[in-house]
Every structure is written in structure tokens, then in C-alpha cells.
Amino acid sequence: MKALVEEIDKKTYNPDIYFTSLDPQARRYTSKKINKQGTISTSRPVKRINYSLADLEARLYTSRSEGDGNSISRQDDRNSKNSHSFEERYTQQEILQSDRRFMELNTENFSDLPNVPTLLSDLTGVPRDRIESTTKPISQTSDGLSALMGGSSFVKEHSKYGHGWVLKPETLREIQLSYKSTKLPKPKRKNTNRIVALKKVLSSKRNLHSFLDSALLNLMDKNVIYHNVYNKRYFKVLPLITTCSICGGYDSISSCVNCGNKICSVSCFKLHNETRCRNR
């Protein structure tokens, strides 16, 4: 098994240098060439690339002062040109206003908004009084918090729960209206003649029997009220049920031979013969 661990020599060891690979086979480049005699494979060691952190840091920080023509210095010059053009395009007040607005938008709780100037002062080194005098909070800008919350306006008030941001009443009303507009409309019930007739009966203080006996209702209104009050399913099922003429039961129904009445048991049959049979 090949050893992938390289022994460290304390005399020549540099902790700032990292190697590309510790496997000697992985550091060799193998190529195959095909000619008339056959395939010839050649291998040569790959150049070992060392990354020294100390050299990279020194090159990074000294390239600006020396002004050499390497890639790092050109990148620094390009960045410096962009920064100069950015500073020339905007004033310091506009930059502070933009930073403050970005930090306020990044704040999760509205109660932490007064602490934004202090944090911005610690980051930029500009005094807090100067930040508060030259910039405006997000609630006072035209496209600030009101635009963020969909046009809702906030007012800082003192309530029984303490200081905080409170929505104005008209804003709450706008939110309720917008919520109602998103809800599906309720389906309207059709105003049929049956409902109108029933409402007339319920709104009147007269007795039902006196109302029906009077000549105010015609035959159509009576049919409408009856069909609305009674259960239609019950009348559809009831004629299909055969009951005993004595006890009203509906199990083991049989009929009398003489008169044809329905009987369910022997006792009902005896009682029927004694009292109700017409053809005895």
C-alpha cells in the first residue's frame, strides 16, 4: 500500500506553505504516444505548486504602494477607479442615507430602528449626531416604510403597552377592505315565490289557521307553503311502508282472508277477528 503521509522535517518545514498533493503518483504526468513501432508511454514529474500565505499577503498589501504591473495591482487600480467614480457620483450624505435605509430595511423588529444610527456610527466612524441630522429615518421618506408595507402609514405613539409603531385607523380600514376584496363572494340565494310566501306568513302576527281560512291565500300560495313546511322525503317513503292495522308494526306482515287488513302476529289476528273484521 502506498503511503500518502509525508514526513515533516522540522528544519525545513514552513507552516505557511501548502502543497497540491502528497501522493507521488498523482504528481506525475503520464502520456501515451502511438508510432509505427507501437505505443510508447512517457511520464514526467509535475511541477509542484506551493501556496505561501505569507507571500500572497505581502504581495497583496505591497502592490498598492509599489504600483507594479501584475494582475493584482491592475485589479486594485480597477477597484480604486470604480470607488473614485462612486464617490464622485454621490455625496457623503446620500451614501449615509442609503446605508441607513438598507440597515433599517434589514432590521426585523420595528422597536430596534432607533438603534440603527448607533450601529451605523460604529461601522462608518461618523458621529451619531451627524448621521441623525443629515439623514432621515425610513418612516419619513417618501418611498420608505409606507412603500414597503403597501402604502400603510405608521405613527409612533405611547399606548398602555409602551412606545411602539402603531397603524393609523384608516390604514387598518384599507387592510380590511383589501382582505375583503380577496375573499370569494357569497352565493346569493334565489328569491323564489316559496320563500316570499313563507316570509309573508312569518312576518304576519295572525294565527296560521285563521290565515289559511281567510280568502287572502289562493290555491297556489297554499301549495307553496305546504311544500315548504312538510318533508317531501317522508311522504315519498311513507306509502311504501305497510303497517299492522292493530299494533302498527311492520315486521311479518300478512293480510286477513276475509277483509284484507294487515296483521303482524297471532294475537293481532285474534283481536282483529273479535273486533275489527268486517266479513266475519
Swiss-Prot record:
Subcellular location: Nucleus
Positions of region (Disordered): 64-92
Positions of Zn(2+) 2 binding: 256, 259, 272, 277
One Gene Ontology MF term: nucleosome binding
GO cellular component labels: chromatin; nucleus; Swr1 complex
Biased composition (Polar residues): 64-73
Spans traversing the lipid bilayer: none
Binding sites annotated in the UniProt record for Zn(2+) 1: 244, 247, 264, 268
Signal peptide: none
Any one GO biological process: chromatin remodeling
Keyword flag Zinc-finger: yes
Keywords recorded for this protein, A-Z: Chromatin regulator, Metal-binding, Nucleus, Zinc, Zinc-finger
Domain of life: Eukaryota
UniProt feature, compositional bias: Basic and acidic residues: 74-92
Zn finger region (HIT-type): 244-277
Assembly and oligomerization: Belongs to the SWR1 complex at least composed of ACT1, ARP4, RVB1, RVB2, ARP6, YAF9, VPS71, VPS72, SWC3, SWC4, SWC5, SWR1 and HTZ1.
Annotated function: Participates in the catalytic exchange of histone H2A for the H2A variant HZT1, an euchromatin-specific factor, leading to chromatin remodeling and changes in transcription of targeted genes. Indirectly involved in vacuolar protein sorting.
Protein name: Vacuolar protein sorting-associated protein 71
Taxonomic source organism: Saccharomyces cerevisiae (strain ATCC 204508 / S288c)
